[in-house]
């Protein structure tokens, strides 16, 4: 009789050690802010979002939640040796500026700040305007 081994619950993560430079992708939407840190080739080192850090509902869209998410992602990335980063901003949410400030405060050297917000050339129909 052959015994089947039970699959492990947690998948073992591959450790990326000693990466001196990388790219920080900040996607700031009206509902959330997502911070991903990659090496120059595009492999993810760490990521965090306002929802992952523990905020829910309308608090996810705040600038403070973006600050906490950026600090969390930067702390994990600095453990793998990250020192200098380029920042790519995408979106028009409240967490754009505060995420960049949090990265600088965490001790990362920001060399370039690039704005890659997608602008439609009259593509999809926008959502309806709010009437308050």
Swiss-Prot record:
Keywords: Ribonucleoprotein, Ribosomal protein, RNA-binding, rRNA-binding
GO MF annotation: an example: structural constituent of ribosome
Disulfide bonds: none
Coiled coil: none
InterPro entries reported in the protein's UniProt record: Ribosomal_uS11, Ribosomal_uS11_bac-type, Ribosomal_uS11_CS, Ribosomal_uS11_sf
GO biological process terms, semicolon-separated: translation
Pfam families: Ribosomal_S11
Oligomeric and partner information: Part of the 30S ribosomal subunit. Interacts with proteins S7 and S18. Binds to IF-3.
Function summary: Located on the platform of the 30S subunit, it bridges several disparate RNA helices of the 16S rRNA. Forms part of the Shine-Dalgarno cleft in the 70S ribosome.
Family stated for the protein in its record: Belongs to the universal ribosomal protein uS11 family.
Protein's name according to its UniProt entry: Small ribosomal subunit protein uS11
Gene: rpsK
């Amino acid at each position: 009789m052959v015994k089947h081994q039970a699959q492990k619950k947690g998948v073992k993560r591959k450790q990326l050690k000693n990466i001196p430079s990388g790219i920080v992708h900040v996607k700031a939407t009206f509902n959330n802010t997502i911070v991903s840190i990659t090496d120059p080739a595009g492999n993810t080192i760490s990521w965090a979002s306002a929802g992952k850090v523990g905020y829910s509902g309308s608090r996810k869209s705040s600038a403070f939640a973006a600050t906490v998410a950026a600090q969390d992602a930067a702390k994990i990335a600095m453990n793998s040796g990250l020192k200098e980063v380029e920042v790519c901003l995408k979106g028009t949410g409240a967490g754009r500026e505060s995420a960049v400030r949090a990265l600088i405060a965490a001790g990362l050297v920001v060399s370039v700040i690039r704005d890659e917000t997608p602008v439609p050339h009259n593509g999809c129909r926008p959502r309806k305007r709010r009437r308050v």
